Amino acid sequence: MASLWAADDVADAAPLVSRERVLPSGLAHLAFRLQGPPVVLYRGADDLVGTSFGHAVVGGPRAEPYLREAVSPAVSVGAQLRAGAVERIFGVPAETLAGRHVALAELWGQDAGRVHSALLCARTAARRIELLTTVLERRAAASTPRTAVPSAVRRALMALDGSADVAIGALASGVSPRHFTDLFARSVGLTPKRFARVRRFQRALGHLTEAAPPSGLATIALAAGYADQAHFTREFVAFTGVSPSRYRSLAPAYRGHLPLPAEAVRISSRRDERTAASSSA
């Protein structure tokens, strides 16, 4: 796993529901919501209903942000998988989940419910992380050699760690460029170019949110691998919808989760009400 997390915000008050933009990481993730409503995702700010994915959901690798319903307080646990781990954990090529969310039951069948029940019985966040770690390690250990990440992709991922130069990754893979792209997309879920782009963004985001970040956006841009500050700003806006300076001022509690302004939802709601009124007139 790349990382595991758990939230244990138990409270007696009714949950506060809002929306947030989840920023892309290029990696797949698995999340269990153990209290409150099911996980709901939205196609955009104009989507007032959303789509429910139940209380256990898998998010495939993606290079674009998405909108979800944020519920606070919440009790949840999840994991972000290392690039190339999707097929070992879920039994399907990463490219089949790219840019998608699916209910875990579609991939694990009845095991999804059993794991969810076990997590519900765990009394602490630490115990939930321990349980989920065990489940994922067992599934990875039980996977067949067929699901292992090809050595060419492993070499490329190591070369791309800290670099956005796809040519370096292709050269390190030791196979032809076309074969490299096909192998990489199957194992990682994104093409080498898209994966390198989103990981460069994540490096920049890491620098931007450090306790003592590098002075100046130009310094951050160069440290992350961008050509210049203008290039960094364009990419940052494309991924987040806001400028780096605006992101800093918002100071989200979790760097990959950007709260959606309530006004955007209210505007969409009024637009929908006007449309409904026109239709009934």
Where do the PLM segments sit?
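Alpha-helical bundle regulatory/interaction domains
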Residues: M1-P177, S187-P192, G206-A227, S243-A281
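Residue-level recognition of oxygen-bearing side chains
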Residues: D165, R200, H231
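Catalytic DNA-binding helix-loop module of base-excision-repair DNA glycosylases/AP lyases
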Residues: H179-V188, A196-R199
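DNA major-groove recognition helix of helix-turn-helix
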Residues: F184, A196, F236-V237, R248
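Amphipathic alpha-helical "recognition" segments
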Residues: K193-V198, A204
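Positions that flank functional sites
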Residues: R200, F236, P252
